Amino acid sequence: MAFTDYETEQLRKALLKETRRCAVTLGMKKTSVDQLTKAVGIAKGSFYKFYESKEMLFFAVLEGIHAELYGVADHALSETDGLPPSERAAKAVLAVCRRLSDTGDMVFIENDAKLLLQRLPEGVKNVHYHDDETHIRQ
């Protein structure tokens, strides 16, 4: 079955949301593609139209978390313009830590990020390696 552009976008968002939930509650190793596809209502074969592997989906989740954390830090820095740099940095770090605690994402990062990065193709890691510089310059 072919999906419309709208359906594709909605299913991609649903896969990301469900994967993030599973990353925190079950972990990457205990989460299966079958489980994810059933949760969003697509056939297992359709999964590969969205992501080439389970690892690439979990990597997309990790990248989303990464981008959110930069946003949290940036927001904290923008709210503390008048403070000394050390206080601004401390507030940004605390804001990021609070977000990690509130979302439970630290569980995924602590338990699965290293293994996930080991399983990714070198080309993928090389393309995304310099993303921090991109976030910082924005």
Identify what each model region corresponds to.
Residues 1-26, 33-39:
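Basic, helix-initiating cap at the start of DNA-binding domains
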Residues 11-19, 36, 61-65, 69-73, ...:
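Generic hydrophobic, amphipathic alpha-helix propensity
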Residues 25-56, 60:
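Helix-turn-helix
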Residues 60, 74-103:
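Hydrophobic alpha-helical connector segments
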Residues 67-70, 74, 117-138:
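Amphipathic alpha-helical packing segments from all-alpha helical-bundle domains
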Residues 88, 98-123:
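Amphipathic alpha-helical segments used for helix-helix packing
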